């Protein structure tokens, strides 16, 4: 996965799995998994 940020939260982006934080500031769009 690729590190990304969803607002003030950190997360991970996996190609083809854009869920969890739509509209977040991440790689190619959104974070797939928000880590906290």
From Swiss-Prot:
Compartment list: Secreted; Nematocyst
Membrane-spanning parts: none
Protein name: Toxin Bcg III 29.21
Stored InterPro entries: BDS_K_chnl_tox (IPR012414), Myo_ane_neurotoxin_sf (IPR023355)
Entry keywords, A to Z: Disulfide bond, Ion channel impairing toxin, Nematocyst, Secreted, Toxin
An example molecular function term from Gene Ontology annotations: toxin activity
Disulphide bridges, residue numbers: 6-31
GO cellular component: extracellular region; nematocyst
Family: Belongs to the sea anemone type 3 (BDS) potassium channel toxin family.
Entry-linked Gene3D superfamilies: Anthopleurin-A
Keyword check for Cell wall biogenesis/degradation: no
């Amino acid at each position: 996965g690729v590190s990304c940020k969803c607002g003030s939260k950190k997360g991970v982006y996996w190609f083809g799995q854009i869920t969890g934080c739509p509209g977040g500031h991440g790689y190619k769009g959104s974070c797939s998994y928000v880590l906290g």
